[in-house]
Amino acid sequence: MHRQSFFLVPLICLSSALWAAPATVNVEVLQDKLDHPWALAFLPDNHGMLITLRGGELRHWQAGKGLSAPLSGVPDVWAHGQGGLLDVVLAPDFAQSRRIWLSYSEVGDDGKAGTAVGYGRLSDDLSKVTDFRTVFRQMPKLSTGNHFGGRLVFDGKGYLFIALGENNQRPTAQDLDKLQGKLVRLTDQGEIPDDNPFIKESGARAEIWSYGIRNPQGMAMNPWSNALWLNEHGPRGGDEINIPQKGKNYGWPLATWGINYSGFKIPEAKGEIVAGTEQPVFYWKDSPAVSGMAFYNSDKFPQWQQKLFIGALKDKDVIVMSVNGDKVTEDGRILTDRGQRIRDVRTGPDGYLYVLTDESSGELLKVSPRN
Protein backbone atom coordinates (compact mmCIF):
# COMPACT_ATOMS: atom_id res chain seq x y z
CA MET A 1 0.00 0.00 0.00
CA HIS A 2 1.20 3.53 -0.70
CA ARG A 3 -0.10 6.92 0.26
CA GLN A 4 0.86 10.16 -1.42
CA SER A 5 1.30 13.29 0.61
CA PHE A 6 -1.77 15.06 -0.73
CA PHE A 7 -3.90 12.36 0.88
CA LEU A 8 -2.23 13.11 4.20
CA VAL A 9 -2.58 16.88 4.20
CA PRO A 10 -6.24 17.02 5.30
CA LEU A 11 -5.53 14.58 8.11
CA ILE A 12 -2.49 16.52 9.28
CA CYS A 13 -4.30 19.82 9.13
CA LEU A 14 -7.27 18.50 11.06
CA SER A 15 -5.29 16.69 13.73
CA SER A 16 -2.29 18.94 14.25
CA ALA A 17 -4.32 21.37 16.34
CA LEU A 18 -4.76 18.55 18.83
CA TRP A 19 -1.33 16.93 18.65
CA ALA A 20 1.15 19.64 17.69
CA ALA A 21 0.29 22.20 20.36
CA PRO A 22 2.91 22.35 23.14
CA ALA A 23 0.16 22.04 25.75
CA THR A 24 -0.67 18.47 24.68
CA VAL A 25 2.40 16.96 26.40
CA ASN A 26 4.44 17.37 29.54
CA VAL A 27 8.21 17.36 28.99
CA GLU A 28 10.88 16.84 31.64
CA VAL A 29 14.55 17.23 30.77
CA LEU A 30 16.27 14.38 32.61
CA GLN A 31 19.77 14.99 31.27
CA ASP A 32 21.43 17.63 29.11
CA LYS A 33 24.90 18.12 27.61
CA LEU A 34 24.88 14.77 25.80
CA ASP A 35 27.16 14.88 22.75
CA HIS A 36 25.01 13.54 19.90
CA PRO A 37 23.26 10.70 21.72
CA TRP A 38 22.10 7.96 19.36
CA ALA A 39 20.22 5.26 21.28
CA LEU A 40 19.08 4.15 24.71
CA ALA A 41 18.28 0.80 26.30
CA PHE A 42 16.43 0.34 29.60
CA LEU A 43 18.00 -1.79 32.30
CA PRO A 44 15.78 -4.02 34.47
CA ASP A 45 14.87 -3.45 38.12
CA ASN A 46 14.77 0.37 37.88
CA HIS A 47 18.48 0.58 37.20
CA GLY A 48 18.06 3.29 34.60
CA MET A 49 19.33 3.04 31.06
CA LEU A 50 22.36 2.81 28.83
CA ILE A 51 22.90 5.65 26.34
CA THR A 52 25.23 5.61 23.33
CA LEU A 53 26.96 8.80 22.21
CA ARG A 54 27.93 8.82 18.55
CA GLY A 55 31.49 9.90 19.34
CA GLY A 56 32.14 6.50 20.93
CA GLU A 57 31.03 6.68 24.56
CA LEU A 58 28.58 4.41 26.34
CA ARG A 59 27.07 5.99 29.46
CA HIS A 60 24.74 4.85 32.22
CA TRP A 61 21.98 7.14 33.45
CA GLN A 62 19.80 6.56 36.50
CA ALA A 63 17.26 8.76 38.26
CA GLY A 64 18.78 10.26 41.39
CA LYS A 65 22.31 9.41 40.27
CA GLY A 66 22.53 11.15 36.92
CA LEU A 67 25.02 10.40 34.17
CA SER A 68 28.00 8.11 34.70
CA ALA A 69 31.51 8.44 33.39
CA PRO A 70 32.10 6.60 30.08
CA LEU A 71 32.04 2.84 30.49
CA SER A 72 35.31 1.10 29.68
CA GLY A 73 35.59 -1.86 27.33
CA VAL A 74 33.57 -0.38 24.46
CA PRO A 75 35.02 -1.08 20.98
CA ASP A 76 36.87 1.63 19.07
CA VAL A 77 34.58 3.32 16.57
CA TRP A 78 35.04 5.35 13.39
CA ALA A 79 33.29 8.57 14.42
CA HIS A 80 33.07 10.48 11.16
CA GLY A 81 30.05 11.90 9.37
CA GLN A 82 27.05 9.79 10.37
CA GLY A 83 29.28 7.06 11.81
CA GLY A 84 30.25 6.26 15.38
CA LEU A 85 28.75 4.31 18.24
CA LEU A 86 25.17 3.60 17.23
CA ASP A 87 22.60 1.27 18.78
CA VAL A 88 22.57 -0.60 22.09
CA VAL A 89 20.21 -3.43 23.06
CA LEU A 90 20.10 -5.96 25.86
CA ALA A 91 20.31 -9.64 25.02
CA PRO A 92 17.07 -11.55 25.64
CA ASP A 93 18.85 -13.47 28.42
CA PHE A 94 20.45 -10.35 29.93
CA ALA A 95 19.30 -11.24 33.46
CA GLN A 96 21.51 -14.33 33.31
CA SER A 97 24.24 -13.41 30.82
CA ARG A 98 24.64 -9.62 31.40
CA ARG A 99 25.21 -9.45 27.65
CA ILE A 100 24.65 -6.20 25.75
CA TRP A 101 24.86 -5.73 21.98
CA LEU A 102 26.32 -2.68 20.24
CA SER A 103 26.40 -1.52 16.63
CA TYR A 104 29.06 0.89 15.44
CA SER A 105 31.00 2.03 12.39
CA GLU A 106 34.37 0.41 11.84
CA VAL A 107 37.08 1.56 9.43
CA GLY A 108 38.94 -0.73 7.03
CA ASP A 109 42.48 -0.68 5.69
CA ASP A 110 41.58 1.61 2.78
CA GLY A 111 40.02 4.27 5.01
CA LYS A 112 36.44 3.34 4.17
CA ALA A 113 34.03 2.12 6.82
CA GLY A 114 31.10 -0.19 7.43
CA THR A 115 28.75 -1.17 10.23
CA ALA A 116 29.88 -3.75 12.77
CA VAL A 117 27.96 -5.50 15.56
CA GLY A 118 29.14 -7.30 18.65
CA TYR A 119 28.42 -8.06 22.27
CA GLY A 120 30.05 -7.91 25.68
CA ARG A 121 29.11 -8.32 29.33
CA LEU A 122 27.96 -5.40 31.44
CA SER A 123 29.61 -5.43 34.86
CA ASP A 124 27.42 -5.62 37.95
CA ASP A 125 28.51 -2.13 39.00
CA LEU A 126 27.59 -0.78 35.52
CA SER A 127 31.06 0.71 35.01
CA LYS A 128 32.47 -1.40 32.19
CA VAL A 129 31.90 -3.85 29.35
CA THR A 130 34.06 -6.95 29.37
CA ASP A 131 34.89 -9.67 26.84
CA PHE A 132 33.57 -7.67 23.89
CA ARG A 133 33.40 -9.75 20.73
CA THR A 134 32.59 -8.52 17.22
CA VAL A 135 30.39 -11.10 15.48
CA PHE A 136 29.28 -9.24 12.35
CA ARG A 137 30.93 -6.89 9.87
CA GLN A 138 29.30 -5.20 6.89
CA MET A 139 31.34 -6.19 3.85
CA PRO A 140 32.72 -4.75 1.73
CA LYS A 141 33.47 -1.54 3.61
CA LEU A 142 32.36 1.27 1.29
CA SER A 143 31.25 4.25 3.38
CA THR A 144 33.09 7.56 3.51
CA GLY A 145 30.74 8.72 6.28
CA ASN A 146 27.15 8.15 5.19
CA HIS A 147 24.24 5.72 5.50
CA PHE A 148 25.37 3.19 8.10
CA GLY A 149 21.93 2.26 9.43
CA GLY A 150 22.75 0.32 12.58
CA ARG A 151 19.46 -0.35 14.37
CA LEU A 152 19.28 -3.65 16.28
CA VAL A 153 16.15 -5.56 17.29
CA PHE A 154 15.60 -8.98 18.86
CA ASP A 155 12.35 -10.51 17.63
CA GLY A 156 11.48 -12.59 20.70
CA LYS A 157 11.97 -15.81 18.72
CA GLY A 158 15.73 -16.13 19.11
CA TYR A 159 16.81 -13.90 16.24
CA LEU A 160 18.62 -10.58 15.95
CA PHE A 161 17.85 -8.20 13.07
CA ILE A 162 20.46 -5.66 11.93
CA ALA A 163 19.43 -2.81 9.63
CA LEU A 164 22.19 -1.70 7.26
CA GLY A 165 22.40 1.37 5.04
CA GLU A 166 23.83 1.31 1.53
CA ASN A 167 26.76 3.59 2.46
CA ASN A 168 25.53 6.10 -0.15
CA GLN A 169 26.39 3.55 -2.86
CA ARG A 170 22.93 3.18 -4.38
CA PRO A 171 23.27 0.13 -6.68
CA THR A 172 24.72 -2.03 -3.90
CA ALA A 173 21.29 -2.23 -2.23
CA GLN A 174 20.29 -4.61 -5.04
CA ASP A 175 23.49 -6.69 -4.95
CA LEU A 176 23.03 -9.88 -2.96
CA ASP A 177 26.80 -10.40 -2.75
CA LYS A 178 27.13 -7.24 -0.67
CA LEU A 179 25.73 -6.27 2.72
CA GLN A 180 24.93 -2.66 1.84
CA GLY A 181 21.23 -1.74 1.94
CA LYS A 182 20.19 -4.96 3.62
CA LEU A 183 18.29 -6.26 6.63
CA VAL A 184 20.37 -9.00 8.21
CA ARG A 185 19.08 -11.82 10.42
CA LEU A 186 21.32 -13.70 12.86
CA THR A 187 20.69 -15.94 15.84
CA ASP A 188 20.93 -14.43 19.29
CA GLN A 189 24.43 -15.92 19.43
CA GLY A 190 25.50 -14.12 16.25
CA GLU A 191 25.31 -17.12 13.93
CA ILE A 192 23.57 -17.42 10.55
CA PRO A 193 20.22 -19.26 10.78
CA ASP A 194 19.70 -22.26 8.52
CA ASP A 195 16.40 -20.89 7.20
CA ASN A 196 17.62 -17.50 5.98
CA PRO A 197 16.28 -16.93 2.45
CA PHE A 198 19.54 -16.79 0.49
CA ILE A 199 21.59 -19.33 2.41
CA LYS A 200 21.62 -21.77 -0.52
CA GLU A 201 21.90 -19.18 -3.31
CA SER A 202 25.32 -19.14 -4.92
CA GLY A 203 27.07 -15.79 -4.59
CA ALA A 204 24.54 -14.33 -2.15
CA ARG A 205 25.32 -13.37 1.42
CA ALA A 206 23.65 -15.86 3.75
CA GLU A 207 23.07 -13.22 6.43
CA ILE A 208 20.51 -11.33 4.29
CA TRP A 209 16.82 -11.36 5.25
CA SER A 210 15.58 -8.64 2.86
CA TYR A 211 17.14 -6.01 0.63
CA GLY A 212 16.64 -2.84 -1.41
CA ILE A 213 16.99 -0.50 1.60
CA ARG A 214 18.50 2.99 1.49
CA ASN A 215 19.27 4.32 4.97
CA PRO A 216 17.30 2.63 7.79
CA GLN A 217 17.03 4.69 10.97
CA GLY A 218 14.25 3.15 13.08
CA MET A 219 13.19 -0.42 13.76
CA ALA A 220 10.86 -2.01 16.31
CA MET A 221 8.67 -5.05 16.90
CA ASN A 222 4.95 -4.38 16.58
CA PRO A 223 3.63 -5.72 19.92
CA TRP A 224 0.16 -6.42 18.51
CA SER A 225 1.15 -8.36 15.38
CA ASN A 226 4.64 -9.52 16.47
CA ALA A 227 5.93 -8.29 13.10
CA LEU A 228 9.12 -6.32 12.60
CA TRP A 229 8.64 -2.75 11.32
CA LEU A 230 11.40 -0.68 9.76
CA ASN A 231 11.65 2.93 8.64
CA GLU A 232 14.21 4.45 6.30
CA HIS A 233 15.29 7.77 4.85
CA GLY A 234 14.44 8.45 1.26
CA PRO A 235 16.55 10.92 -0.71
CA ARG A 236 14.66 14.18 -1.31
CA GLY A 237 11.26 12.76 -0.39
CA GLY A 238 10.29 9.13 -0.07
CA ASP A 239 10.89 8.32 3.60
CA GLU A 240 9.22 4.95 4.16
CA ILE A 241 7.79 2.53 6.70
CA ASN A 242 8.08 -1.14 5.72
CA ILE A 243 7.21 -4.49 7.27
CA PRO A 244 10.15 -6.49 5.90
CA GLN A 245 9.37 -10.02 4.77
CA LYS A 246 11.71 -12.93 4.13
CA GLY A 247 13.61 -12.59 0.86
CA LYS A 248 11.69 -9.55 -0.38
CA ASN A 249 13.09 -6.60 -2.34
CA TYR A 250 12.09 -3.18 -0.99
CA GLY A 251 13.07 -1.39 -4.14
CA TRP A 252 15.88 1.07 -3.55
CA PRO A 253 17.14 2.50 -5.85
CA LEU A 254 14.91 0.99 -8.56
CA ALA A 255 11.64 2.03 -6.90
CA THR A 256 11.36 5.21 -4.84
CA TRP A 257 8.88 7.97 -4.04
CA GLY A 258 11.74 10.46 -3.80
CA ILE A 259 14.10 12.29 -6.13
CA ASN A 260 17.76 13.25 -5.92
CA TYR A 261 18.79 16.16 -3.72
CA SER A 262 19.67 18.02 -6.92
CA GLY A 263 16.02 17.88 -7.95
CA PHE A 264 16.66 15.36 -10.71
CA LYS A 265 15.48 11.76 -10.92
CA ILE A 266 17.47 9.02 -9.17
CA PRO A 267 19.57 7.61 -12.07
CA GLU A 268 18.70 3.97 -11.38
CA ALA A 269 15.01 4.58 -10.60
CA LYS A 270 12.38 3.01 -12.85
CA GLY A 271 9.41 4.59 -11.11
CA GLU A 272 7.48 4.61 -7.85
CA ILE A 273 5.89 1.19 -8.36
CA VAL A 274 8.20 -1.39 -9.97
CA ALA A 275 7.47 -5.06 -10.64
CA GLY A 276 9.34 -7.39 -8.31
CA THR A 277 9.65 -4.83 -5.53
CA GLU A 278 7.52 -4.25 -2.45
CA GLN A 279 5.63 -1.06 -1.71
CA PRO A 280 5.96 0.61 1.71
CA VAL A 281 2.99 0.47 4.05
CA PHE A 282 3.43 4.25 4.39
CA TYR A 283 5.61 6.91 2.82
CA TRP A 284 6.13 10.65 3.02
CA LYS A 285 6.43 12.59 -0.21
CA ASP A 286 8.21 15.32 1.77
CA SER A 287 10.86 13.74 3.98
CA PRO A 288 10.73 14.41 7.74
CA ALA A 289 14.02 12.43 8.05
CA VAL A 290 12.56 9.67 10.20
CA SER A 291 14.63 8.17 13.00
CA GLY A 292 14.04 6.02 16.10
CA MET A 293 10.56 4.56 16.48
CA ALA A 294 8.50 3.05 19.29
CA PHE A 295 5.10 1.41 19.54
CA TYR A 296 3.14 2.41 22.61
CA ASN A 297 2.22 -0.79 24.41
CA SER A 298 1.37 0.31 27.95
CA ASP A 299 -1.76 0.90 29.99
CA LYS A 300 -0.26 4.02 31.60
CA PHE A 301 -1.80 6.52 29.18
CA PRO A 302 -4.89 5.12 27.38
CA GLN A 303 -4.92 7.99 24.88
CA TRP A 304 -1.61 6.75 23.49
CA GLN A 305 -2.62 3.13 22.99
CA GLN A 306 -2.31 1.81 19.42
CA LYS A 307 0.07 4.67 18.63
CA LEU A 308 3.42 4.60 16.88
CA PHE A 309 5.91 7.36 17.69
CA ILE A 310 8.68 8.21 15.20
CA GLY A 311 11.41 10.78 15.67
CA ALA A 312 12.08 13.30 12.90
CA LEU A 313 15.56 14.74 12.42
CA LYS A 314 14.82 17.32 9.73
CA ASP A 315 11.33 18.27 10.90
CA LYS A 316 12.54 18.42 14.53
CA ASP A 317 9.54 16.78 16.18
CA VAL A 318 7.96 13.43 16.98
CA ILE A 319 5.44 12.02 14.51
CA VAL A 320 2.35 10.44 16.09
CA MET A 321 0.70 7.67 14.07
CA SER A 322 -2.31 5.42 14.63
CA VAL A 323 -1.82 1.72 13.93
CA ASN A 324 -4.55 -0.58 12.63
CA GLY A 325 -3.17 -3.94 11.57
CA ASP A 326 -0.54 -3.23 8.93
CA LYS A 327 -1.97 0.20 8.16
CA VAL A 328 -0.86 3.49 9.70
CA THR A 329 -2.14 7.04 9.49
CA GLU A 330 -0.40 10.17 10.69
CA ASP A 331 -2.26 11.91 13.52
CA GLY A 332 0.10 14.86 13.88
CA ARG A 333 3.21 15.90 15.76
CA ILE A 334 4.46 16.55 19.29
CA LEU A 335 7.54 18.43 20.57
CA THR A 336 7.32 20.79 17.59
CA ASP A 337 7.89 23.80 19.82
CA ARG A 338 11.30 22.60 21.02
CA GLY A 339 13.05 22.79 17.64
CA GLN A 340 15.31 19.80 18.36
CA ARG A 341 16.43 17.00 16.06
CA ILE A 342 14.91 13.79 17.42
CA ARG A 343 17.23 10.78 17.22
CA ASP A 344 15.61 8.07 19.33
CA VAL A 345 12.19 7.38 20.82
CA ARG A 346 11.45 4.55 23.26
CA THR A 347 8.54 3.50 25.45
CA GLY A 348 9.81 3.09 28.98
CA PRO A 349 8.86 0.29 31.37
CA ASP A 350 6.96 2.94 33.36
CA GLY A 351 4.76 3.83 30.37
CA TYR A 352 6.38 7.20 29.69
CA LEU A 353 7.94 8.13 26.36
CA TYR A 354 11.71 8.72 26.39
CA VAL A 355 13.36 10.80 23.69
CA LEU A 356 16.95 11.61 22.73
CA THR A 357 17.75 14.79 20.82
CA ASP A 358 20.59 14.73 18.30
CA GLU A 359 22.72 17.78 19.06
CA SER A 360 26.17 18.60 20.38
CA SER A 361 24.38 19.37 23.65
CA GLY A 362 21.64 16.79 23.28
CA GLU A 363 19.00 15.99 25.86
CA LEU A 364 17.21 13.02 27.36
CA LEU A 365 13.51 13.87 27.64
CA LYS A 366 10.68 12.21 29.53
CA VAL A 367 7.34 12.84 27.83
CA SER A 368 3.75 12.22 28.89
CA PRO A 369 0.35 13.40 27.62
CA ARG A 370 -1.15 16.39 29.36
CA ASN A 371 -4.66 15.63 30.61
Curated annotation (Swiss-Prot):
This protein's UniProt keywords: Calcium, Cell outer membrane, Membrane, Metal-binding, Oxidoreductase, PQQ, Signal
Enzyme class label: oxidoreductase
Cofactor: Ca(2+); pyrroloquinoline quinone
EC number(s) from the headed UniProt entry: 1.1.5.-
Superkingdom of the organism of origin: Bacteria
Subunit structure: Monomer.
Name listed for the protein in its UniProt record: Aldose sugar dehydrogenase YliI
